[in-house]
Each structure stands twice: as structure tokens, then as C-alpha cells.
């Protein structure tokens, strides 16, 4: 009995692996639109998919980012300047993409653009500190999707939303984790709505990677700017050495970040080219071995482990 059970499990694993290796054909006539291509995951994705033969349309925020990307890619790749928080800019870009791709439609939409915003204790913040990451990571992603969706439906293509382990666990105050939690919800509802149209929707959840978004120095500079304007009561509660201690803790945590950005781009590649793309992709050793498993644990265990990473307050009773 045990033998047959093991044989069945082996067969299921083999078939699952085989199914995941089946690829689409005719990449050369398929268009892919990627946001956030100035640096990081988006930049590497644009270069990678251009080399594979896709017709890439790379959305950059800056002229310099666009020029640098063009210099490293083929004539197939086109760049557009796009601020995902500007509705008129998004609308005009979608109109241009529609005229560019014609009847072929858009095989892939990769929503990659994102910002970290301010990462600081919640009682340091104002509602304005939450706006930027929510505007970019959530409303920008939704607006781009809604404008490009008719083209994706025409091609019966793919939508790939880059979320984060911050969409599974809230590891700090600010707008980043609320925005990513919301992206997860939008992704799931979109996936179910698009099922009948033959459109596959996938979500990528990267761990901590060495990108501009995760720069510990920039994160600390933003935190320090807020600290200077805090009330004396808040400063007394946290202590004058809090910023330095949190920077030291942040640097020690980021010393083990993932350096290989291709781990995320590889997930994008599978979601674009597999006949049977996954609904979710987990990228990075830390995400697979710590963050995602922890997200399934009871809240009391999550709190215990995450609070161990926090800097101890000088005088929390001084309220």
C-alpha cells in the first residue's frame, strides 16, 4: 500500500513538473508592456525579454532611464515615459500602445513600478506619509491595468503583478505594506474576473532584494527627516539613539538580501511563457524559507519573531 502511495505521489510530482515546462510558441509576434523600467527588476526584465525576442514596450519614469535602456537593447524595444500616478499620462500611453500593437493586442502586462515610501513607526507618521506608495503601488497599478486590459483580453494574454512579502506580512509602518496587501486583493479578484476571457493573472512576491527601493541609507534619511519634526514626547519615548540603532539593525538585516534580480525576472518569464502559469510566484531564499512560511503561522508567533527585530524603545511609558 505504501509503495503505491509513494508511486502516486512521484507520478503527480512528475506530471506537475512536466506541465510547468510546457511553453508557448511564436514569441516574436507577442508584445509585452512593462512598467518601472528605469532600474531594478523592470530594467532587467525589459533587457531579458528583448533578448528572448519579445516585442517589449518599456515604460520609464525618466528620460535618462529611457535613454540608458535603449542603449542596451535592440531596435525591437520601444520606451515610453510614464508616471503611473498621472491618469492622463496613463490614458495617452494606453492609446499609443493600442495603435502600436494593432490587432495582435498585448500578450503581457507586467505591473512592476513601485516605491517604498516612508518606513517608520506608525505614530511618527501623518496620512500624507502613506499617500505616495499607495498612489504608485496600488492606484497606479490599477489604473494601468484598467487601461491596458482590453488589449490583453484581445490577445488572451497575461497580467503579472509584482507584489511583495510585504503583501503577506506587515514589517513596518507606512504606506508600503498596506499598498501591497491591497495589490494581493486586486490581483485575486482580477484573476477570477479574467478567467472566462482566457487571460491568466499571476502575482509575484519577492523577498528582500538589493535594489534602489531597499537602500538602507535612503530609508534612514527619510526616517531622520521625520524624526526632526517629532514632538518632544515622541522623541522621549523612542530615545535619541533610536535612529542610529535602527540603521544598524537595518544594515544587519539587509546584509543577507538577495543579490540575484534574475530570480524575480525568472518568475516573470515563466508567467509569460508557460502554457500553465502559476497563480503565485515566490522569489528569493528569504521569502521561501522565512517570510511566506511565517505568513501562515498564528499571529502570536508572527508578532514574537518580528518584534525581536525591532529596536527597543528608551521609555515607552513616557506618555
UniProtKB/Swiss-Prot annotation:
Stated role? 3-alpha-hydroxysteroid dehydrogenase that converts 3-alpha-tetrahydroprogesterone (allopregnanolone) to dihydroxyprogesterone and 3-alpha-androstanediol to dihydroxyprogesterone. Also plays a role in the biosynthesis of retinoic acid. Can utilize both NADH and NADPH.
Query: Tell me, what is an example of a GO biological process annotation in this record?
Result: 9-cis-retinoic acid biosynthetic process
**EC numbers for this chain:** 1.1.1.209, 1.1.1.53, 1.1.1.105
Q: How does it assemble?
A: Homotetramer.
Homology family: Belongs to the short-chain dehydrogenases/reductases (SDR) family.
Q: Can you state which reaction this protein catalyses?
A: 3beta-hydroxy-5alpha-pregnane-20-one + NAD(+) = 5alpha-pregnane-3,20-dione + NADH + H(+); 17beta-hydroxy-5alpha-androstan-3-one + NAD(+) = 5alpha-androstan-3,17-dione + NADH + H(+); androsterone + NAD(+) = 5alpha-androstan-3,17-dione + NADH + H(+); 5alpha-androstane-3alpha,17beta-diol + NAD(+) = 17beta-hydroxy-5alpha-androstan-3-one + NADH + H(+)
* Active site, renumbered: 176
UniProt GO molecular function: alcohol dehydrogenase (NAD+) activity; all-trans-retinol dehydrogenase (NAD+) activity; androstan-3-alpha,17-beta-diol dehydrogenase (NAD+) activity; androsterone dehydrogenase [NAD(P)+] activity; testosterone dehydrogenase (NAD+) activity
Q: What is its main location?
A: membrane
Where NAD(+) binds, per the record, is at 34-58, 83, 180
The record's Pfam families line, in alphabetical order, gives: adh_short
* Annotated GO CC locations: endoplasmic reticulum membrane
List UniProt keywords, sorted A-Z. Answer: Endoplasmic reticulum, Lipid metabolism, Membrane, Microsome, NAD, NADP, Oxidoreductase, Signal, Steroid metabolism
Q: What is the lineage of its organism?
A: Eukaryota, Metazoa, Chordata, Craniata, Vertebrata
State the protein's name: Dehydrogenase/reductase SDR family member 9
User: Which residues does the record give as substrate binding sites?
Assistant: 164
Looking up PANTHER family in the UniProt record yields: DEHYDROGENASE_REDUCTASE SDR FAMILY MEMBER 9, SHORT-CHAIN DEHYDROGENASE/REDUCTASE FAMILY 9C
Q: Where does the record say this protein resides?
A: Microsome membrane; Endoplasmic reticulum membrane
Signal peptide residue numbers = 1-20
